[in-house]
């Protein structure tokens, strides 16, 4: 059966030709041939030049997601195994693989698919209709490739409950793939133990992208008084604790997250000096300032304040406010670790916003380092959506 052909409008396809992976609905001139959403299609530019193969979904603004630039490449099990094997071999070279992101969508050339490995458990998230059809085959291939390295996967859980699926015309879903198993999974990262709730935790249960950023703050925290804002399940706070901080306070608005963080502190024998409170950070920080509290290290790891270009302006206000409040709580010569996990809060804008907050707080910033996401979340150049995490460490000085 011949594949349908998607032909782009004249002058369109520049992003695709320069390394991008997406074709938007407004770039398409015609679709010739029969198809159902989720099918593999051929992609041509306006002049008929072949650009590759991808899967189509006319319900989505991202109408075609590229799978290969070779128009003659069959999308079969052999093709998928090569993708899976390449992804695993890459991670073995660049990161600790006991717990890691095994598949990172477009950056691993499997668009719309996320797979996290937590020890001997896989958590999968499918965000595109076409990859949904291939998901089970890919998971079997992942188990095969891992088994070759002596890693037996005891269970798979699906967390396809992200709202973005609705933009693909897909239902939200979460549940077991195969036999059921306990959904609290213990992992060790940077010497810290965690209980990861893969069923009810945020996203896939744990934010693996901050792995080496958490490690980076350890050297600042010995004998320090530390405030960790938006702590989630306590990862930055616990890294501070294990590094020898004398007192750590973690703050989160979710009681579930605070309860999990408290259990994680007990798991590491740190519950005597690492404490967690359930508070709204935006309300708490002004109170701490009024009370004259000061910290050696303040960590700001907020959720994404914007998930679209249209809400960036409001997000800037949020980032400016939280950094202003955080800076005012840092002792002269202390440190601020601050980040944004929103793709739409671009590096230049985030940097500018922190600078504005520092001026308003009458603080001078000395940059210690700039970091981004862990290498198991690779940044694919020309695929801007793969670069989202911005992470700064500053020394904070009073104006002199």
Residue ranges and their predicted role:
Residues 103-116, 135-206, 215:
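Non-catalytic substrate-recognition/targeting regions of SAM-dependent transferases
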Residues 60, 130-132, 202-203:
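Short, surface-exposed beta-strand-loop junctions and turns on beta-sheet-rich folds
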Residues 78, 82, 86-90, 94, ...:
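A short, charged
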Residues 1-113, 117-119:
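Non-catalytic accessory regions of SAM-dependent methyltransferases
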Residues 175, 179-400:
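Rossmann-like S-adenosyl-L-methionine
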Residues 65-74, 123-135:
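Short histidine-centered catalytic/ligand-binding loop motif
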